[in-house]
Amino acid sequence: MTARPGRRGYLDWMRGLAVVVMVFWHTLDAWTTPVDKASGAFWYCQLIGGFGAPIFLFLAGVSVALAAGSRLRRAGASPGGVPADAGPPPGLAPASSQPAPDLLPASSRPQPGLSPASAGPAPGLSPASAGLQPGQGPAWAAAWPMVKRGGWIWVLAILFRIQSDVLGGRTSIGQLFMLDVVRGNTQKVDILNVMGPAIAGAAVVWGLARTAGWRIAGSIAVASAFAFATPGIRAWTALDPLPDAIEGYLRPFAGRTTFSFFPWAGFVFAGAAIGVLIDRTRDVVAERRLITWFGAGGVALWILSALSAYGPSLFGPSDFWRTAPSFFFVRVGIMVAGIAACYLWEARPRLLGADPFSPMRQFGVTSLFIYWVHVEMVYGGLSRPIRGQLPLPISLLAFLLFLTAMLGLSLLKSTIAERVRARRSR
């Protein structure tokens, strides 16, 4: 029998690609002159850069399913089905990965989310060890750590906003209080604000469902609901009286929201459905077969969704690039097919028995770190002399130089982390 797949390097590679896209967009957005931003070339750069956030969110959902499935197996149950007495509540723990995914804002000061991706072992989990009452079921217990992780990511989003204010020169308690509490700056919604609750929600769906089939169906249903409801939510006047801090999570508006639940949270649930499919594979042969279906199915979804954009809108007026369900599913199709492309790319050297260093995988396993350090470097005081001052070709060159520096920081971070782990294990 062929061995069960280990850590899935192709998911790390895909997350690394999201990191590169994120840095690409942030550097160009921050440093390019307004004149060049009005050019057609910059529009295409923005189109490419806009895929960073969906990939991060999508892979965060994949990690939810892989992590929970790994914990459930270690507890002695099969992820494909749960005993009849398995009860509800959520959970989530990074079982095949590390932190949770990344993201990519468009314009404005972004906030990336980011999450590991693939398969690492995770300790077994019983309802008692998860802090749940006995009888709630092993699936609940396996999912619960991921629910908590989603909550921590949301807290991280708030802390990141406060850090941005401190590094921006607003260091007094009075200034921070006025900006973050009175004016509600910490309530601004960015990628991590959406990613955290969406991860928790995807874990709840995973923990409540009793079989892999129901987990897939439930995740797809929720993802579709976010996509199809987006045009109506954007135009629904009944939401106008809501406090800005709440409305900003439902739909974007100037000055407060870069991302919102509709439709962005849907990418996490779409990724969770794909993660369940990957987690069900029992050996590398089965996983290779599944990846083939991802390639064909992703391209088919991509094409059909693009064609549907030419038909009448069934869910009210929509903007293709911002609110149309068809564009949501176009991106999902591209990302599903992208998994197959990353798998094939990662398999090339292994066909020759080699395992060379991969900058993309390195970025993938340190994505949160890269996000955390690069945002202030790109948008903060360090780059103030070149902000909005570079022609597009020079911005592209600056991006390559900056990306090289980020790779060096990533390697340094990994080296230090390994030394710390080695000392602790002595």
Residue ranges, per PLM feature:
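Alpha-helical transmembrane segments and their immediate juxtamembrane cytosolic regions
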Residues: 1-81, 88, 97, 132-426
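Intrinsically disordered, low-complexity repeat regions of secreted/extracellular protein precursors
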Residues: 87, 98, 102, 109, ...
